């Protein structure tokens, strides 16, 4: 009689333990490496990933833009860095030229373009360059559906812009791009500041600086923003599934200690309430890179000054009296009703929803789309139409 074959459960469990031990070792090693400032910066900016490889910045046509529509320019910053940038003509200005125009046509029409058409000042996210195909599609949408010019820069250390990116350095780059537009003859009220992902922190800081200087510009658009780098670390999930900080959060106080090693802040949440212009915050609900809850937090920070506060008794909840619980509940109900009365919600079938309110005399909008992911949300025609109706008049589009 043959002997039955029994599974080697002990061997299987041993292999599983080894796999988890290796994964734990790799995780611990990655966590330790990310406390090193040089490695931390490279992971955050990913500027060494210069996609597309061998980009032809002096020939934008090779990346999908129309012949003679884009000027490849250089912008000098206050700390003597030179930034590569593209200035792309609006369709109205471009279509007034004979086709095909000479290669230098866009450069010759910059002053005319910025005085006759609105301009989108665009700040891209981490990694890659201004020539990335997704970004080029975004420019094309802005120049056609918004009929606006576009100025897109590569920060220091990105693309053909030499240097090393830093939080303060990117802020100087943004201000240099703004100053360049104004020097070409653009009116501040004709400039719409748009940022995507990492670029939302750059756009927010520039917008706050301009607001504090009393400059009235057209507005600010934050596409797929994060509230702060600290919060992003807490909420980031690999492939949208595996929470990066979960093992660390299981150790008391370990997360706080770890985040103390972060050398970058990019804290938009702490400054966004200083903006005094129309604001559009937009996010795709299927964004696996940055959760759309970050946009909720930014929108709530803008709404907070207009809501009644909620006061808690200065003792532990276990010691609250029935009366104190009742008063606390009443405050919550009053706050919820105040929020509902301030907000106007618009549901757009098969697309998403918008919440809007008027703060400090300006319209604040939160747009959530059902699709678009992290990188493509700005290329959606519906998103560009929301930007159009939020910031542009019919006269702007003629």
What are these regions (language model features)?
Residues 274-276, 281-283, 287:
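Short beta-strand/loop motif that positions the catalytic acidic residue
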Residues 289-292, 296, 307-398:
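C-terminal catalytic histidine-bearing segment of alpha/beta-hydrolase fold enzymes
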């Amino acid at each position: 009689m043959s002997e039955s074959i029994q599974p080697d459960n002990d061997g299987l469990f041993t292999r599983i333990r080894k796999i988890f031990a290796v994964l734990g070792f790799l995780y611990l090693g990655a966590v330790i490496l990310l406390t090193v400032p040089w490695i931390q910066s490279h992971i955050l900016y990913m500027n060494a990933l210069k996609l597309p490889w061998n980009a032809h910045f002096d020939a934008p046509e090779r990346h999908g833009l129309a012949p003679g529509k884009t000027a490849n320019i250089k912008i000098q910053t206050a700390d003597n860095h030179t930034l590569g940038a593209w200035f792309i003509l609006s369709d109205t200005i471009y279509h007034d030229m004979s086709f095909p125009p000479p290669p230098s046509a866009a450069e010759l029409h910059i002053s005319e373009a910025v005085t006759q058409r609105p301009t989108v000042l665009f700040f891209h996210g981490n990694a890659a360059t201004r020539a990335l195909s997704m970004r080029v599609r975004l420019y094309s949408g802005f120049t056609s559906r918004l009929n606006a010019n576009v100025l897109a820069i590569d920060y220091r250390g990105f693309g053909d812009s030499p240097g090393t990116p830093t939080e303060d350095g990117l802020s100087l780059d943004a201000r240099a791009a703004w100053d360049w537009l104004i020097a070409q003859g653009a009116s501040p009220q004709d400039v719409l500041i748009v940022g995507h992902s990492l670029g939302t922190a750059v756009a927010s800081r520039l917008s706050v600086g301009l607001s504090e200087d009393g400059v009235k510009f057209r507005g600010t658009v934050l596409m797929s923003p994060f509230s702060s780098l600290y919060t992003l670390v807490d909420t980031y999930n690999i492939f949208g599934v595996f929470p990066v900080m979960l093992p660390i959060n299981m150790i008391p106080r370990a997360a706080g200690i770890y985040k103390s090693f972060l050398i970058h802040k990019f804290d938009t949440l702490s400054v966004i309430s200083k903006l005094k212009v129309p604001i559009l915050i937009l996010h795709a609900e299927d964004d696996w890179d940055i959760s759309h809850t970050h946009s909720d937090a930014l929108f709530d920070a803008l709404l907070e000054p207009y809501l009644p506060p909620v006061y808690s008794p200065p003792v532990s909840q276990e010691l609250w009296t029935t009366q104190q619980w009742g008063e606390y509940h009443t405050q919550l109900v009053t706050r919820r009703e105040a929020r509902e009365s301030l907000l106007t919600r618009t549901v757009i079938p098969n697309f998403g929803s918008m919440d809007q309110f008027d703060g400090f005399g300006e319209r604040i909008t939160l747009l959530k789309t059902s699709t678009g992911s992290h990188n493509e949300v700005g290329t959606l025609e519906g998103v560009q139409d929301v930007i159009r109706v939020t910031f542009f008049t019919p006269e702007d589009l003629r």
